């Protein structure tokens, strides 16, 4: 007989495994679906950017609703069900505006899934009376990343047999499997939720923006993390046009996910301790220059396989660096606000705007448009070098 805590763990595993596998089977291949429906690169960029913008708005709005109703489990189940159903709209959709509309609605339903599932998981990971933690959050997220990679590879293999529309069915099936799981897990919230901004919080934004180190951190994120916009939007199309099969493309992308997990869980923090934030930021920026330059010039399979693991440096190491810098310079009572600005401006808004720009760039220059992403990382190098200066404003 399975214990109560074991049953809860299994439900969380199914929830995270199904959610992140659902993300993996569709999101990397969505640009190929749009390309298959004869959308121009400029329109593909618009469609993806519109979805990102909707995710930024919907995640916050739904999180506040879940807090106000004190019903994160029900809201998560409803949003997961809605995402499964809305995603099926890609099957009949034809034409740019209808595809964009489906994408925006799908993004609105998908946006709350990671933060709401994290809210429940963090609550269950908190000490639960004398029994200790129900789950280990970091391990659970690691399982989610592994599920994303497995879904990515599986989807790539099935596309070769059933066509690109298989990603829609896989996504809907996995989200449907995840939908009832939140209702069976405990609601032990670890934090007080997403309160509305107060005048003191608004003043806190001004305090943060006056911290030189914090401004540099956000700008570094905008340049280096934002440079992934071309890859996330057009790498699959670039490889497909070069004759690389969807199955092989899925394996290539999974190399980047695996490298991200390795850096986050194993080598990232020791490397950051050894070379410091400035060295880590320069390494991330330099890796970005190399990665995007190779993407611009060749689709030779060994070369692409060699550069995809650089994602561990261009994304994971840079994220760890930003978190280290934030801890050094931001007052503790402003950490939540600082993280929100970092996530929405440094990552979200910058990536959405760059994705919008990548459409016309890819349409005009094709693969050589990746040089623009290399230029962003090159621009980050001198900024990273300034992190060696004394850290005024460190707490």
Regions found by a protein language model. Give the residues of each.
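Cytoplasmic helix-loop-helix junction between adjacent transmembrane helices
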Residues: 103-143
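Symmetry-related core transmembrane helices of the 12-TM Major Facilitator Superfamily/SLC fold
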Residues: 166-184, 368-386
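Conserved MFS/SLC helix-loop-helix module at the cytosolic interface between two early adjacent transmembrane helices
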Residues: 57-94
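Helix-to-loop junctions at the C-terminal end of transmembrane segments
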Residues: 57-71, 159, 263-276, 362
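Helix-loop boundary and gating motifs at the non-cytosolic
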Residues: 2-52, 213-252
């Amino acid at each position: 007989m399975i214990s109560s805590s074991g049953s809860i763990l299994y439900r969380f595993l199914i929830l995270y495994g199904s959610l992140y596998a659902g993300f993996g089977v569709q999101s990397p291949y969505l640009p190929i679906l749009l390309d298959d429906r004869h959308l121009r690169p400029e329109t593909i960029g618009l469609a993806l950017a519109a979805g990102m913008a909707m995710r930024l708005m919907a995640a916050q709005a739904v999180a506040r609703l879940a807090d106000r109703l004190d019903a994160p489990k029900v809201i998560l189940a409803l949003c997961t069900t809605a995402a499964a159903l809305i995603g099926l709209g890609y099957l009949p959709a034809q034409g740019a505006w209808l595809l964009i509309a489906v994408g925006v609605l799908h993004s609105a339903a998908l946006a709350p899934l990671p933060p709401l599932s994290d809210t429940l998981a963090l609550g269950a990971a908190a000490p639960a009376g004398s029994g200790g933690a129900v789950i280990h959050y970091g391990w659970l997220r690691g399982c989610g990343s592994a599920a994303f990679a497995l879904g990515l590879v599986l989807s790539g293999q099935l596309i070769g047999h059933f066509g690109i529309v298989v990603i829609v069915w896989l996504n809907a099936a996995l989200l449907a499997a995840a939908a009832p799981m939140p209702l069976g897990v405990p609601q032990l919230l670890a934090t007080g939720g997403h309160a509305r901004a107060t005048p003191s919080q608004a003043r806190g934004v001004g305090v943060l923006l006056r911290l030189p180190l914090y401004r540099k951190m956000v700008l570094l994120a905008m340049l280096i993390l934002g440079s992934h916009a071309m890859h996330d939007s057009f790498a699959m199309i670039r490889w497909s046009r070069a004759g690389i099969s969807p199955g092989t493309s899925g394996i290539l992308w999974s190399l980047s996910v695996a490298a991200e997990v390795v850096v986050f869980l194993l080598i990232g923090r020791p490397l950051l301790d050894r070379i410091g934030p400035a060295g880590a930021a320069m390494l991330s920026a330099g890796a970005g220059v190399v990665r995007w330059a190779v993407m611009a010039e060749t689709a030779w399979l060994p070369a692409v396989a060699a550069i995809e693991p650089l994602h561990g440096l261009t994304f994971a190491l840079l994220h760890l660096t930003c978190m280290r810098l934030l801890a050094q310079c931001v007052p503790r009572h402003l950490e939540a606000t600082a993280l929100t600005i970092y996530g929405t401006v440094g990552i979200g808004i910058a990536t959405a705007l760059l994705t919008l720009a990548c459409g016309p760039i890819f349409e005009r220059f094709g693969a050589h448009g990746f040089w623009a992403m290399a230029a962003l990382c090159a621009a980050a190098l001198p900024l990273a070098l300034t992190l060696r200066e004394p850290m005024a404003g460190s707490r």
